[in-house]
C-alpha cells in the first residue's frame, strides 16, 4: 500500500515544485566503502536507540511492540524480500527522498535539505523500530547526495544496507532457529539443553557470531571515521535566514499534514489496541 498509494501521491505533490540538482562529483571505490561503513554504524546505533525506546514502550503498556520489518522479512519468501527490499525499495526511496526532496529544498540550505530528507524518510517507515536509524541514515544519504549529486551512490549504499538488514540477518536468524531457542530458554532449560540446542544448529551459530563480530567491527570503525572526518561534514547555508528555516520548511501545511499522518501511523503501530477499542465501539 505504501508504494501503490502514498508514493505516487508524494511524487505528484513534490514534482510540482521547482528543483535544482546538486553539482555532480564522482567518488572512488574506497570512498564508497568508507561511506558504507559509516552508514552501517549509523544504522546499528539508530537500531539500538529504536530498540531501547520500543522496549520501554512495551514495558509500559504491558506487551511487546511489533517489529513490522522483521515480521515482514521473516514471514515472506526470500526471493520476494530480495526484490522488494534490496532492489525496488532503495531505487524508489532514493529517488523520492533524496532526488526529489533534496533538489527542491537545497536552496533553503544544505542542512535544511539533509534534515528534512532524513525526517521524511524516517517517518515514512511508519514504525518506531525503524524511525531512529532511518532518520539518521536518511540524513547521511542526503548529505552524500548533496555533496556528490550522484543518486547511484546513495542507491548503491541503500541496497547494501537493506541486503545486510533484510536478507543476511534474516537468513542467519532462520539458520539458528531463533524461535526454538526462545522456547528452550522460556521452558527453563538447563545449560546442557541449551548446549544441545546450539550444537544442533552449530553452523548457523558460527555464521551468526561472525555476523555479530562484523556488526561490532563496523560500528566501532564507523564511529572512528565520523570522528576523523567530522570537519568535512560541513553544509552550506541557503537563502533563508536562520530563524525562518523551520517555519518555512516544516511549518507549511503540506509538511504538517505529512508529519501528523505518519506520527499517527507510528502511534497506531505501537498501540494497535487503541484501534481495536475504537472500531469495537462503532
What are these model-predicted stretches?
Residues 1-40, 55-57, 220-243:
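Membrane-helix interface linkers and caps
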Residues 19-89, 103-106, 270-282:
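Juxtamembrane helix-loop-helix connectors linking adjacent transmembrane helices
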